[in-house]
């Protein structure tokens, strides 16, 4: 299921793992966004970073711009093939993809993930913003918008030739998010929500809105950072992931608030 699967990147195979953590990156991100997670994560956790078309080893493939098309492809590629418990972690756009994939599995009658961790993301029912059409901006305006998110190094944004290569995938990711149509259907699994206290793009109400997306428990964790807090606060984020897995009885000895 993960071996020789173009959708899954595992830097450190964990044959004795007790839980598998699928990680979904933000718009413009890739499996490389989680490259340093396996070495820092509890050894009982197998970190599997998702590599979507249009980036990394799949750079020559056309990116997908429809959420239903993407989750259908992911649903087939990641369909459970063993008894190892799985948890989804997604940041920003990745949170939306992880959420919709969990719902897709439920519709298909597949074993649901044991938990969903959504990070840096508005609740899906509160995502729609008709005034926000970043995927329609010209290149200069889109690069300026990326700078506002504070997730891309300024020297990269200033590299004209490199941005010419990256912008089509970034634009496709924004189209994926901005064309998303929400339909209410709460999950039957626990959710944990991670958010930055200084995130200018997400309000506390939009964070708390995730509670309506599950019939199970929903825990909210705040971090002292902006929209991309998962990078500078990596160790704190990973420690909170581990405690959350313990809270869900997937890791022993790590139960915590």
For each feature predicted by the language model, list its residue ranges.
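Domain-scale detector for complete catalytic domains at protein termini or as standalone homologs
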Residues: 1-89, 96-257
């Amino acid at each position: 299921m993960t071996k020789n699967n173009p959708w899954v990147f595992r830097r450190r195979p964990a044959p004795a793992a007790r839980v598998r953590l699928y990680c979904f990156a933000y718009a413009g991100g890739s499996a490389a966004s989680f490259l340093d997670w396996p070495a820092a994560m509890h050894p009982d956790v197998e970190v599997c970073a998702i590599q979507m078309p249009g980036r990394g080893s799949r750079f020559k493939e056309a990116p997908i711009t429809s959420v239903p098309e993407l989750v259908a492809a992911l649903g087939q590629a990641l369909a459970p093939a063993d008894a190892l418990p799985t948890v989804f972690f997604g940041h920003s756009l990745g949170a939306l993809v992880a959420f919709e994939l969990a719902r897709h599995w439920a519709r298909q009658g597949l074993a649901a993930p044991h938990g969903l961790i959504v990070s840096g993301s508005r609740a899906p029912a509160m995502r729609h913003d008709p005034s926000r059409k970043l995927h329609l901006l010209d290149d200069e305006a889109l690069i300026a918008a990326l700078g506002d998110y504070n997730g891309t190094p300024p020297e990269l944004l200033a590299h004209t030739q490199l941005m010419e290569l990256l912008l089509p995938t970034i634009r496709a990711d924004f189209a994926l998010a901005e064309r998303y149509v929400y339909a209410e259907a709460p999950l039957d699994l626990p959710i944990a929500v991670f958010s930055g206290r200084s995130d200018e793009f997400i309000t506390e109400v939009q964070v708390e809105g995730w509670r309506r997306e599950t019939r199970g428990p929903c825990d909210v964790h705040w971090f002292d950072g902006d929209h991309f807090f998962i990078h500078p606060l990596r160790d704190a984020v990973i420690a909170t992931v581990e405690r959350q897995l313990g809270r869900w009885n997937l890791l022993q000895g790590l139960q915590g608030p």
